[in-house]
């Protein structure tokens, strides 16, 4: 099981990410895409990253907006896995 991060560690790691915010035991970011098909294509790419990492975000799709939420359920909060996947997601944008 991944080790849950402290509040200080979470804040430090959030400083390395752009647009991700903490909401309770999750980090979250909304992406604005140019069209609905491009939003779906983005989600498919996120799915491949998530599957490879064995770590899956909650995904909310609303037309051209995609909101991703990351947490590590079995750790009961945020772990390095969440920040690693957030970084990978940002790299495909």
Curated annotation (Swiss-Prot):
InterPro entries documented for this protein: PCD_sf (IPR036428), Pterin_deHydtase (IPR001533)
A GO MF label: 4-alpha-hydroxytetrahydrobiopterin dehydratase activity
Entry's Gene Ontology BP terms: tetrahydrobiopterin biosynthetic process
SUPFAM superfamilies with a match to the protein in the record: PCD-like
Keywords attached to this entry: Lyase
Enzyme Commission designation: 4.2.1.96
Gene3D superfamilies recorded: Transcriptional coactivator/pterin dehydratase
Catalysed reactions, semicolon-separated: (4aS,6R)-4a-hydroxy-L-erythro-5,6,7,8-tetrahydrobiopterin = (6R)-L-erythro-6,7-dihydrobiopterin + H2O
UniProt cross-references to HAMAP family, sorted A to Z: Pterin_4_alpha
Family per similarity comment: Belongs to the pterin-4-alpha-carbinolamine dehydratase family.
Name the UniProt record assigns to this protein: Putative pterin-4-alpha-carbinolamine dehydratase
Lineage of the species this protein comes from: Bacteria, Bacillati, Chloroflexota, Chloroflexia, Chloroflexales
